[in-house]
Structure formats: structure tokens, C-alpha cells
Design a protein with these regions (language model features):
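WD40 beta-propeller repeat blades
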Residues: 1-81, 85-96, 179
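Hydrophobic beta-strand positions that form the internal "hydrophobic ladder"
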Residues: 47, 125, 166-167
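Conserved strand-to-loop turn within each blade of WD40 beta-propeller repeats
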Residues: 51-52, 68, 128-130, 169-172
Length: 219
């Protein structure tokens, strides 16, 4: 039999570290809605996904299957293997995400304001949950508007009408129309960027087509 040498005897025992893992999304039992509407950003750089859940993996007790928070995950187009960021703090799970199709000028930022993305323009999107709608902009990490108590059932879909009006529909059979204006002169989401101001040729061509839509004819 081979006798262990002194080096092997003095070598400390190595503990096997278990890599904690968890799911990213709710299953069909927990997500009791007809839809999971994810969407790409207007510039095509990232994808936002609803029905997401986040686990705090600091301890095994916290990482239990029933102990999670509702969130929305963002995936960058060049790396879809894992989320690049998340938007936590949702009271209930997200069912639908809808981007405003236009790009906007960035407002003057406060010194302590941390952007969600450092972009030369501002993008606006709405997140619908079972009982709320949260409107975000990419130049800040907190919502610019939170709307609640407007439906008796989960919100199934949303759409932007022009650049200031958001329409949401619910399983209760009703639609809600929300305007993003404080008064006649103040717009919550900012001023639209003119197509000719965009440096990216693909984006400029896309927004030139959007700019030709006459929304007054639809009223």
C-alpha cells in the first residue's frame, strides 16, 4: 500500500461548492393569464420579457421555490444566454410589455439620476401587470408613471396611439385610454426626435416611415 507523503497529509480538504441555480420565468400554474407579450426595443438592441421571477440566492432558505420577487428581464441582442438587467419591484407578475415606437429627446438629467441605458436618445415603454401599468424611460431606473385600479382582471395587451396615448385592454372586456400629458404644454415622455436627426441609417429610414402616418385621420 502506498503511504501518503507529508505534502499530501498537509494538504487541506477541499469542500465541494454547489452552484445555485433558479428558473427565470413563472410556470403556467403561477402565471394565470392568457398571454406573455415580450417585445424588442425600437432600436433593436434589447428584448424585454414579462412573467419573470427573481430569487435572492444568499441562502438556501431565501432560494426556495416559493420565495421570489416579480420582475422583468432585459436581454441584449448580442448575448441572449442570460439577462443583462432587470426591473424589480413589481407587486404582481408582468403580462405585457409595449414600447412606444418613437425615439425621444433626452430631458435634462438630475445629478443623482442613474440611467437604465446610456443612449443618445430616450425610449419609453409600458409594463402591464395584473393590476398596474408602469411606464418607464431608458434614461432613468424608476417609473415615470404608475397607473393602477383601472381594471377588474389582468391586462392582456397594450398599444401606443401616436406618441402620447397608451391604450390597454383587459380580460374584463374593457379598454383604458391614458394620455401622457400633465397639461396642454407638458408631456411626460418628452419631445420626439426628428428622423433626420438620427445618425443610424436604418433607424432613420424606419422613423421616416412612421413620421408619414397621419393619426388625425384615425380619429
Amino acid at each position: 500500500m502506498k503511504e501518503p507523503n507529508s505534502a499530501e497529509q498537509s494538504k487541506p480538504e477541499q469542500k465541494t461548492q454547489r452552484v445555485a441555480s433558479h428558473r427565470l420565468f413563472l410556470d403556467d400554474i403561477e402565471h394565470q393569464s392568457f398571454v406573455r407579450r415580450l417585445q424588442w426595443s425600437p432600436d433593436g438592441n434589447f428584448l424585454l420579457t414579462p412573467s419573470a421571477c427573481y430569487y435572492d440566492l444568499q441562502s438556501e432558505e431565501q432560494a426556495s421555490r416559493s420565495n421570489y420577487s416579480y420582475t422583468v428581464y432585459g436581454f441584449l441582442k448580442h448575448n441572449m444566454s442570460q439577462p443583462a438587467f432587470m426591473l424589480p419591484g413589481l407587486k404582481t407578475y408582468a403580462t405585457c410589455i409595449k414600447f412606444n415606437p418613437f425615439l425621444f429627446e433626452k430631458p435634462w438629467a438630475k445629478p443623482d439620476q442613474v440611467p437604465l441605458f446610456d443612449l443618445p436618445y430616450r425610449m419609453v415603454f409600458a409594463i402591464a401587470t395584473t393590476d398596474q401599468i408602469l411606464v418607464y424611460a431608458t434614461d432613468q431606473q424608476t417609473p415615470i408613471a404608475v397607473i393602477g385600479n383601472i381594471h377588474y382582471a389582468p391586462i392582456n395587451d397594450m398599444t401606443w396611439y401616436s406618441n402620447e396615448v397608451l391604450v390597454a385592454c383587459s380580460s374584463d372586456g374593457y379598454c383604458s385610454i391614458m394620455t401622457m400629458t400633465k397639461d396642454d404644454e407638458t408631456n411626460l415622455i418628452g419631445k420626439r426626435i426628428a428622423p433626420e436627426a438620427l445618425e443610424d441609417e436604418t433607424l432613420r429610414s424606419h422613423y421616416e416611415q412612421l413620421d408619414k402616418v397621419d393619426y388625425d385621420k384615425l380619429e
